[in-house]
């Protein structure tokens, strides 16, 4: 298989298939016999041991069998015996030298390992007598089925390490990456397996648990500098005689903030936990020894060593070794799109020795064990050994089916669970749910530091001023006892006092307000019916609400293909036969016409059928050959359903679509036998059987597949299908008259993103075939370079072909994908598609979904070595630099890079080159990439640029990519929920990204930006008056306002305007945001939030605070503030005036920045002022008498009873806000932003003439595309490349009867049964041979014989 990803190591010639030559671990095996020794070179004379192996060491197998076995068990499972310098480890899996037969020595453990083992032993009970531990003895008891029921409880109760690993870390006690001792799994012995403490099948995607919530939550909250700042302030307030305010005001407010944040985090994590619970409670069928049958259990209850039954279309619940299946020789088909993104089905096959276990009775009698590698993250390797009846059977990736795969085209399989839960390879490739911080939050943290610097400056000015004033006026202020005061101590005390006094410049309610805003924004996103997918009853779910504003600033989208952009459903769309193009439904503008002697457009499939059935039509023989090729030249297996229909089992979805297309056109493939295929001609009811002589299989080098048939009339024909490039060069130069028309049709297909194949044939004489067949057979039996020699043999016969036509298959897209991608690109978002599929497939999808277009130049990087990749990248960079590309030119570039080249390009020395080329392209497609490479690509762009990234996928193979991006979006698909559970946002369809980003993203970013800026502004506007006041009170640290009133400012009186703006404000309507995607660039450019904008708001707050302080102090200092009784206002009355005026100004500012007034806006802005005006007299009347706030005693009559107070509340706010109003007027009238213009259009419902211009430009572009020379012809074909397809299809005889669930039912139909002499006439009377695995029943003992000549065995 031409694949850049990790593949399992191949065995060297001459290596034995067994994992051990001597079975140390089989408790049923006797070691008695002649005295023998095993050295570490016993298995293979060519084996070169690693440096740490001691070649001289041997084990005497006959000295003391029991002691030897105990020693091996001790080293293998417990690693406690380190008295000797070397501990033997049976079957240690070494990644450097794949020699599973060897017995290896490992280095003695280091200090830390010994310490860890000491702890383990300390918490494990020991026997009073003998060297063996309590645990070891119970292991021996387990192997002899003598374990009492209380053992597991006692073991887990006292082994702290196992308890911690199992219930806290949810992992196995073995090595984290599979480098430790191999695990032993006993078949049909759950008690023995339970003793090892293997992980259960529980999975969790939550951020917290009971043990980690508090530390993780506090770490997350106090990583926000504002919360850390107020924690310090709260501590300072507790120092006696320092705080000018109440000591509990800050800590009380901080606790409220933390409690609200904690509640929000808990609610979101509970949602994740519920989602996990839904998956964990999925059901599977587990073989029960107690019931002698399969019983339904939850996934979470599946344990290592369980035998499970999986039916067709069901997901695999855990990493499983296939034991048997309903198909011949234990074959099964699995879909791994959820794991690696590949669309073609994979073929897995059980070992022949286990394929006989096909019913409950045989499973019950299955005894043995598996020695398996430890859990690890490698998706493409596996090593293990199964021991059955003293025979050791090697296990490889061919028998391993991973969790996350789905069983297809196979009625059922039986499997042995090897890894569960977080030990499965799928979960090993997943990372812990990361804690992500938004770009806005990072800016806030930096600006808080800057604001803190300003705060320090203000504190220093005030503290130094107080020291100077105290020193200079000490003699005049003798009553203050300032003489002899320690200046350093005074400075330090003043520093702390002013810290507390000015600390509210940083809004303490900022983050809780923002968190609540984001929570409700997330709720509104989830409530949007436009983002609800009715077909699967799936709403959009925001799992991490703290990231919603990131949706408005995305510059790159990294998307999976299969299941995200496409449905993974292939449909036969059109075909070209004899120069004519046929399609089922013809678009109005595509009807076939003749222009300049050339037929343009499509004909209907009905016309094709008419021509086929008209013997006088010259195209009839060609159409017959074309449809016969579709029905015969493939590796598909037909399967009759209960309703009489046929379901085609196809490893390649393309082949399935082609065969189905042929059936729809009247040539129905109905029977496959080992040496023939049968086709039903529906028009006449005639069945034609074609003898299958040879199959020349598809691979990525050949790009074609051929089959040779003997027709019913005795003639021999070769059918060939493949890429246009390879078919054209093999055509007969004289007998091909349809080439030009066919190529023209291929170009039309490619422009529509359809997957194309060329079809050709030739007649072969008997003599030529016999001569070639001898060459082919010789190549098929050679041991060296067999694949290359088979390809050479195929080349000899695949010549002088006659082109008969071409096919077009549509890889059906998800709804709305092309329109969504086009709109997102108009919004300035670059889209990268990362897929495990082949290059041709990826390019075709790029064309069909409008990621690529005909006028784009493809920059293809498909190299085999690092040096070639570097050279290719540098050549492209130099070429692009020479042309001095404009923006328009860059919009015509697309990069296509394959997985192998990408692996080289991701190296530190080359990644800058890759990113340079990629940034110049409008679109990037990475094909044949592994899940790890997907994540590495995202991390590279994330690390090398300041852009915000979004990753979207639907499969488990996309989880790492999703978690690596700033925002991860998972599609709640039909095949699994792993991506959706691990994502920040779960959606039902890719098309929902359009509104999610353009509307909700833009709204969220603008709302959050204004809410944050406003929060800082309002605190600056009020609390800076405290700083101005120090110049009037001799730097004494006296506060203008009462303590609790200051705290209530953020909690009650100004909290609602930013909240309402953050939740309900709309700067542009959703309709216009979707209509003009260019508005999205406002977020990408940081138009609403930046350092410059932030300090503009802060300075505005300084300005407003100065106006309030100066205005009020002039009024009160000069005695203008008289109440109705002619009494002058006091200090606290002046403070209330300052406070109330500031509240009115900041509420007025909120009114100016509000874009859309709603009922909530009216409640929030005027309502907040009204709330304060009502609250103050109640508070000032009650609390002083309760001895809580005596400052406000009698203040109400000095304020509410003064006309100057009310006049001040009118004049000063107008004076302060007039500048803001004039600035807003100037910007809109003379320097309008883009969204200002759109707002005017929205307000006055002004129509836009630009659509007509755009339509004209699109028309011009289409004309130019037609006039251009087209090169893309759309070849794509998905097919597994492991080889062996011919062998597989020759195993099948679909005339054999099958039961309800697809199992073989007749002795003559069993591929393992000896020939019992039943002829075709006896077939119906044959007695049932294989028991229905879904029902109990008796079965006679029978002898099986594999279709492999060299293997036979008994039940």
UniProtKB/Swiss-Prot annotation:
Mg(2+) binds at residues 560, 562, 954, 958. Changing residue 1235 to A: Abolishes ATPase activity and leads to cold sensitivity. Residues 30-44, 1307-1323 have a biased composition (Polar residues). Residues 1-15, 1346-1355 have a biased composition (Basic and acidic residues). Residues 1230-1282 are annotated as: Interaction with GEA2. Belongs to the cation transport ATPase (P-type) (TC 3.A.3) family. Type IV subfamily. Changing residue 380 to F: Increases ATPase activity. The chain crosses the membrane at residues 222-242, 247-267, 450-470, 491-511, 1013-1033, 1044-1064, 1095-1115, 1132-1152, 1162-1182, 1203-1223. It is an enzyme of class 7 (translocase). Present with 606 molecules/cell in log phase SD medium. It catalyses: ATP + H2O + phospholipidSide 1 = ADP + phosphate + phospholipidSide 2; a 1,2-diacyl-sn-glycero-3-phospho-L-serine(out) + ATP + H2O = a 1,2-diacyl-sn-glycero-3-phospho-L-serine(in) + ADP + phosphate + H(+); a 1,2-diacyl-sn-glycero-3-phosphoethanolamine(out) + ATP + H2O = a 1,2-diacyl-sn-glycero-3-phosphoethanolamine(in) + ADP + phosphate + H(+). Residues 1-104, 1231-1309 are annotated as: Involved in autoinhibition. The gene is DRS2. The C-terminal part (1231-1309) serves an autoinhibitory function and is dislodged upon substrate binding. GO terms for molecular function: ATP binding; ATP hydrolysis activity; ATPase-coupled intramembrane lipid transporter activity; magnesium ion binding; phosphatidylcholine flippase activity; phosphatidylethanolamine flippase activity; phosphatidylinositol-4-phosphate binding; phosphatidylserine flippase activity. The modification Phosphoserine is found at residue 102. This is Phospholipid-transporting ATPase DRS2. Residues 1-221, 268-449, 512-1012, 1065-1094, 1153-1161, 1224-1355 are cytoplasmic. Residues 16-26 have a biased composition (Acidic residues). The record marks 508 as: Involved in the release of the transported lipid into the cytosolic leaflet. Changing residue 342 to Q: Loss of activity. Does not appear to reduce interaction with CDC50. Sensitive to cold. It comes from Saccharomyces cerevisiae (strain ATCC 204508 / S288c).
């Amino acid at each position: 298989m031409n694949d850049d990803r990790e593949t399992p190591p191949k065995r060297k010639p001459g290596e034995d298939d067994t994992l051990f030559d001597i079975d140390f671990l089989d408790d049923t095996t006797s070691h008695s016999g002649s005295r023998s020794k095993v050295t570490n070179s016993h298995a293979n004379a060519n084996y070169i041991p690693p440096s740490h192996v001691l070649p001289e060491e041997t084990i005497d197998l006959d000295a003391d069998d029991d002691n030897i076995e105990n020693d091996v068990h001790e080293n293998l499972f417990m690693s406690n015996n380190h008295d000797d310098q070397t501990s033997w480890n049976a079957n240690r899996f070494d990644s450097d030298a794949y020699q599973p037969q060897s017995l290896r020595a490992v280095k003695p453990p280091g200090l830390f390992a010994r310490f860890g083992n000491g702890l383990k032993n300390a918490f494990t009970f020991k026997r009073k007598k003998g060297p063996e531990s309590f645990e070891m003895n119970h292991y021996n008891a387990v192997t002899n089925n003598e374990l009492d029921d209380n053992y597991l409880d006692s073991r887990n109760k006292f082994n702290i390490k196992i308890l911690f690993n199992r219930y806290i870390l949810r992992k196995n006690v073995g090595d984290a990456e599979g480098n430790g001792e191999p695990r032993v799994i006993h078949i049909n012995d759950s008690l023995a397996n339970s003793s090892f403490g293997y992980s259960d099948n529980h999975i969790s995607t939550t951020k917290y648990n009971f043990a980690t919530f508090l530390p993780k939550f506090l770490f997350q909250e106090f990583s926000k500098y504002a919360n850390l700042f107020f924690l310090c302030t709260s501590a300072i307030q507790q120092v006696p005689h320092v705080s000018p305010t109440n000591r509990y005001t800050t800590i009380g407010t901080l606790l409220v903030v933390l409690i609200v944040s904690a509640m929000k985090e808990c609610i979101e994590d509970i949602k994740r936990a519920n989602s996990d619970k839904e998956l964990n409670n999925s059901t599977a069928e587990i073989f029960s020894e107690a019931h002698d049958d399969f019983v339904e259990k939850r996934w979470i209850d599946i344990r290592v060593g369980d035998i499970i039954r999986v039916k067709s279309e069901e997901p695999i619940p855990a990493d499983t070794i296939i034991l048997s299946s309903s198909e011949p020789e234990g074959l099964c088909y699995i879909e791994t799109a959820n794991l690696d993104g590949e669309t073609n089905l994979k073929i897995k096959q059980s070992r022949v020795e286990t394929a006989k276990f096909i019913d409950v009775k045989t499973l019950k009698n299955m005894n043995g064990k598996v020695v398996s590698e430890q859990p690890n993250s490698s998706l493409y390797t596996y090593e293990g050994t199964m021991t059955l009846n003293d025979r050791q059977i090697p296990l490889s990736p061919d028998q391993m089916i991973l969790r996350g795969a789905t069983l297809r085209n196979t009625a059922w399989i039986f499997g042995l669970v090897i890894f569960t839960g977080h030990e499965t390879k799928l979960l090993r490739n997943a990372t812990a749910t990361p804690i992500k911080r938004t770009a806005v939050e990072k800016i806030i943290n930096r600006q808080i530091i800057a604001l803190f610097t300003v705060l320090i400056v203000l504190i220093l000015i005030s503290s130094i001023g107080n020291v100077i004033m105290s020193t200079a006026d000490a003699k005049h202020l003798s009553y203050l006892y300032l003489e002899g005061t320690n200046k350093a101590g005074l400075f330090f005390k003043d520093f702390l006092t002013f810290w507390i006094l000015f600390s509210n410049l940083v809004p303490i309610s900022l983050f809780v307000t923002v968190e609540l805003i984001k929570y409700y924004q997330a709720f509104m996103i989830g409530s949007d019916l436009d983002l609800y997918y009715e077909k699967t009853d799936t709403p959009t779910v925001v799992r991490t609400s703290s990231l919603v504003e990131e949706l408005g600033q995305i510059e790159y989208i990294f998307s999976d293909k299969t299941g995200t952009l496409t449905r993974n459903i292939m449909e036969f769309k059109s075909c070209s036969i004899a120069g004519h193009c046929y399609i089922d439904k013809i678009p109005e503008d595509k009807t076939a016409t003749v222009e300049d002697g050339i037929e343009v457009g499509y004909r209907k499939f009905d016309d094709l059928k008419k021509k086929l059935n008209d013997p006088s039509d010259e195209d009839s023989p060609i159409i017959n050959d074309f449809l016969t090729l579709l029905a015969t030249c493939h590796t598909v297996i037909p399967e009759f359903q209960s309703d009489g229909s046929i379901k085609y089992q196809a490893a390649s979805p393309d082949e399935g679509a082609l065969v189905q297309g042929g059936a729809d056109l009247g040539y129905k493939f109905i029977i496959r036998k080992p040496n023939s295929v049968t086709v039903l001609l529906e028009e006449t009811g005639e069945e034609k059987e074609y003898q299958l002589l040879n199959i020349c299989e598809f691979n990525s080098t050949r790009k074609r597949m051929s089959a040779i048939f003997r027709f019913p009339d005795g003639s021999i024909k070769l059918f060939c299908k493949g890429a246009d490039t390879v078919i054209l060069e093999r055509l007969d130069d004289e007998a091909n008259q349809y080439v030009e028309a066919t190529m023209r049709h291929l170009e039309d297909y490619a422009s529509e993103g359809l997957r194309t194949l060329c079809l050709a044939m030739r007649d072969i004489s008997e003599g030529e075939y016999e001569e070639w067949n001898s060459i082919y057979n010789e190549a098929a039996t050679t041991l060296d370079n067999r694949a290359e020699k088979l390809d050479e043999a195929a080349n000899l016969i695949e010549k002088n072909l006659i082109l008969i036509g071409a096919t077009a298959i549509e890889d059906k897209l998800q709804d709305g994908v092309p329109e969504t991608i086009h709109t997102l690109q108009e919004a300035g978002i670059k889209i990268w598609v990362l897929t495990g599929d082949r290059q041709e497939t990826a390019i075709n999808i790029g064309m069909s979904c409008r990621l690529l277009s005909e006028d784009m130049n493809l920059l293809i990087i498909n190299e085999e070595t690092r040096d070639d990749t570097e050279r290719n990248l540098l050549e492209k960079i130099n070429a692009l630099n020479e042309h001095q590309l404009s923006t328009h030119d860059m919009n015509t570039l697309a990069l296509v890079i394959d997985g192998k080249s990408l692996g080289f390009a991701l190296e530190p020395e080359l990644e800058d080159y890759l990113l340079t080329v990629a940034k110049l392209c409008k679109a990037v497609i990475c094909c044949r990439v592994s899940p790890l490479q997907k994540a590495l690509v995202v991390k590279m762009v994330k690390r090398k640029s300041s852009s915000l990234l979004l990753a979207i996928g639907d499969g488990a193979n996309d989880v790492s990519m999703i978690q690596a991006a700033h925002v991860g979006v998972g599609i709640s698909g039909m095949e699994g929920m792993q991506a959706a559970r691990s994502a920040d946002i779960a959606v039902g369809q890719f098309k929902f990204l359009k509104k999610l980003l353009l509307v909700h993203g833009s709204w969220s970013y603008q709302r959050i930006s204004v809410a944050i800026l406003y929060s800082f502004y309002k605190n600056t506007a009020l609390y800076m008056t405290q700083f101005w006041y120090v110049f009037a009170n001799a730097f004494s640290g006296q506060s203008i306002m009462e303590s609790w009133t200051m705290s209530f400012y953020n909690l009650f009186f100004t909290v609602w305007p930013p909240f309402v703006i953050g939740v309900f404000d709309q700067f542009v309507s959703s309709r216009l945001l979707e209509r003009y995607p260019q508005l999205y660039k406002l977020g990408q450019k940081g138009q609403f939030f930046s350092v410059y904008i932030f300090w503009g708001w802060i300075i505005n707050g300084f300005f407003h605070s100065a106006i309030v302080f100066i205005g009020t102090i002039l009024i009160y200092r000069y005695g203008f503030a008289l109440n109705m009784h002619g009494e002058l206002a006091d200090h606290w009355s002046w403070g209330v005036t300052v406070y109330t005026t500031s509240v009115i100004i900041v509420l007025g500012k909120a009114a100016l920045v509000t874009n859309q007034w709603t009922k909530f806006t009216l409640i929030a802005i005027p309502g907040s002022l009204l709330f304060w005006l009502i609250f103050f007299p109640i508070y000032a009347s009650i609390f002083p008498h309760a001895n809580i706030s005596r400052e406000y005693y009698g203040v109400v009559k000095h304020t509410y009873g003064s006309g100057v107070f009310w006049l001040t509340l009118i004049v000063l706010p107008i004076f302060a806000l007039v500048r803001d109003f004039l600035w807003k007027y100037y910007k809109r009238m003379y320097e309008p932003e883009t969204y200002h213009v759109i707002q005017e259009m929205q307000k006055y419902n002004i129509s836009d003439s630009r659509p007509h211009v755009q339509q004209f430009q699109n028309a011009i572009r289409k004309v130019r595309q037609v006039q251009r020379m087209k090169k893309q012809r759309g070849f794509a074909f998905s097919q597994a490349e492991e080889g062996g397809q011919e062998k597989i299809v020759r195993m099948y005889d679909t005339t054999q009867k099958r039961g309800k669930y697809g199992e073989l039912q007749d002795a003559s139909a069993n591929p393992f049964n000896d020939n019992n002499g039943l002829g075709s006439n006896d077939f119906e009377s044959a007695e049932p041979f294989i028991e229905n695995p879904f029902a109990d029943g008796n079965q006679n003992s029978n002898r099986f014989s594999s279709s492999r000549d060299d293997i036979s065995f008994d039940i």
